[in-house]
Amino acid sequence: MSFSEFYQRSINEPEAFWAEQARRIDWRQPFTQTLDHSRPPFARWFCGGTTNLCHNAVDRWRDKQPEALALIAVSSETDEERTFTFSQLHDEVNIVAAMLLSLGVQRGDRVLVYMPMIAEAQITLLACARIGAIHSVVFGGFASHSVAARIDDARPALIVSADAGARGGKILPYKKLLDDAIAQAQHQPKHVLLVDRGLAKMAWVDGRDLDFATLRQQHLGASVPVAWLESNETSCILYTSGTTGKPKGVQRDVGGYAVALATSMDTIFGGKAGGVFFCASDIGWVVGHSYIVYAPLLAGMATIVYEGLPTYPDCGVWWKIVEKYQVNRMFSAPTAIRVLKKFPTAQIRNHDLSSLEALYLAGEPLDEPTASWVTETLGVPVIDNYWQTESGWPIMALARALDDRPSRLGSPGVPMYGYNVQLLNEVTGEPCGINEKGMLVIEGPLPPGCIQTIWGDDARFVKTYWSLFNRQVYATFDWGIRDAEGYYFILGRTDDVINIAGHRLGTREIEESISSYPNVAEVAVVGIKDALKGQVAVAFVIPKQSDTLADREAARDEENAIMALVDNQIGHFGRPAHVWFVSQLPKTRSGKMLRRTIQAICEGRDPGDLTTIDDPASLQQIRQAIEE
């Protein structure tokens, strides 16, 4: 079957299509209804069926290939490596499941996980899935008041954390941040379970705090039966990053999530049992949830949990892992590749990467210079894919198992099965033509694996995502265009639009142009208020040649050259009013550019919540650049 036929069947006959894909996982009780869409926009998949994520990820493969590698935990920060076969992982998950039950955690209870990228984090999430508890991972980069808000929203029965994590040689004091968060929260968890890594001193709270290792010793050899869950019971809550005010918890189911991930591993990611999948993300983000915690294991692959940066202790660290563990498939974000692009390629090519078959990139738009560089350097297909926290798996990609069309630089590919993607005119709501920019939406119902609702707030779910044009379309909040061959291009957020004297431009379009200039390593473009034009674009550039930063005359020449390039590629209306050169740009710890923060600084406004920022010194660089 061609991909076109596969895709059209998913749109024209969604129930028959997804009933077939559901055979990829084990069901204890068969489902009686593939889709219940009687209360749009809410969609319920595989109704009446019972299954379990942990069973499908661990037990199923323990029975088929007990001695195959399942979990590889690597920390370049502490120079530790631990490996678990499927048999060993099964044993550890049962122990932790018994620990959770001993602390009174029941089916449907929330367990908040605030942990570094260590094996215990992965095992804890699988243990939650085993007993039917709902896990809610809070990214380790969040500060205390943000953690407190998530505690109050999820109301966990238990919090699992650690003394500390590490990043770039710096210790991140998780326990101290967590203590501060609990002090600020209204909801008080009964217990806090702590992994003591010996990285930071902890203040223990009697009666509340428990040592992970001590409790583990009490449950060695435990066997905990799987809780068979109705497909639409909640598996997890994952809060979207950068949220202000009340957190927005994306709620996901059990059966639909398992089926979607299992299908994606086969058709999109080419996962084969016995292989090794290295997703260089964090379990606190959706990419980590889907493609570290669950999807590789669902496919019978080993999954790598990595603590550290791509450049610490040196920029060869990822490639050492690829070589040592014979990684077949790798998943990262364009930001990490841009960082690596600044270093000599010899530090990559010195490693035997012959096992690597493909690199997948997602999380932000992939610019053409970065795509070209990494494709040439690694010598393997580089496959962009586009999705969101809310979708849980790719909305757009290239399904290599079914589709041999070539990648197109700058494009995340074509809509994936189940996603009835449309581009609509922002004013009329009518479909856009070829190469016509529009708002990217998805016709309901959303396919399996996507957001069920916002935790505890159905009304907010409907208002936030389903209120465009009085139609049953899900708003992605992204601009896009489609070319004559059906490839899509993402042009940036609908709220990252610059209106320059009546010309509406996505920041992505200007960034793409500037990125093609030879001396540009990375760029961020924002729109700021202007008395004459309403808004103007300004650009902050990290140059490849750092002497640009020291020589004002050289910087002025480079600025003029970049402006001329934008004039030529987009038009004079797209030309930035200023191009400033900096050595770093404000980003979250997951690599997302903080464009709104940059914009606020440029306009003299309060930049707001900065709890997720990686390096606060980058803000000072922005301030200094605009003052000079």
Swiss-Prot record:
<dbReference type="InterPro" id="IPR032387">
    <property type="entry name" value="ACAS_N"/>
</dbReference>
<protein>
    <recommendedName>
        <fullName>Propionate--CoA ligase</fullName>
        <ecNumber>6.2.1.17</ecNumber>
    </recommendedName>
</protein>
<dbReference type="GO" id="GO:0019629">
    <property type="term" value="P:propionate catabolic process, 2-methylcitrate cycle"/>
</dbReference>
<keyword id="KW-0547">Nucleotide-binding</keyword>
<dbReference type="Pfam" id="PF13193">
    <property type="entry name" value="AMP-binding_C"/>
</dbReference>
<dbReference type="Pfam" id="PF00501">
    <property type="entry name" value="AMP-binding"/>
</dbReference>
<dbReference type="InterPro" id="IPR012694">
    <property type="entry name" value="Propion_PrpE"/>
</dbReference>
<dbReference type="InterPro" id="IPR042099">
    <property type="entry name" value="ANL_N_sf"/>
</dbReference>
<comment type="pathway">
    <text>Organic acid metabolism; propanoate degradation.</text>
</comment>
<dbReference type="InterPro" id="IPR025110">
    <property type="entry name" value="AMP-bd_C"/>
</dbReference>
<dbReference type="InterPro" id="IPR000873">
    <property type="entry name" value="AMP-dep_synth/lig_dom"/>
</dbReference>
<comment type="function">
    <text>Catalyzes the synthesis of propionyl-CoA from propionate and CoA. Also converts acetate to acetyl-CoA but with a lower specific activity.</text>
</comment>
<dbReference type="GO" id="GO:0050218">
    <property type="term" value="F:propionate-CoA ligase activity"/>
</dbReference>
<dbReference type="GO" id="GO:0005524">
    <property type="term" value="F:ATP binding"/>
</dbReference>
<dbReference type="Pfam" id="PF16177">
    <property type="entry name" value="ACAS_N"/>
</dbReference>
<comment type="similarity">
    <text>Belongs to the ATP-dependent AMP-binding enzyme family.</text>
</comment>
<dbReference type="InterPro" id="IPR045851">
    <property type="entry name" value="AMP-bd_C_sf"/>
</dbReference>
<keyword id="KW-0436">Ligase</keyword>
<keyword id="KW-0067">ATP-binding</keyword>
<dbReference type="InterPro" id="IPR020845">
    <property type="entry name" value="AMP-binding_CS"/>
</dbReference>
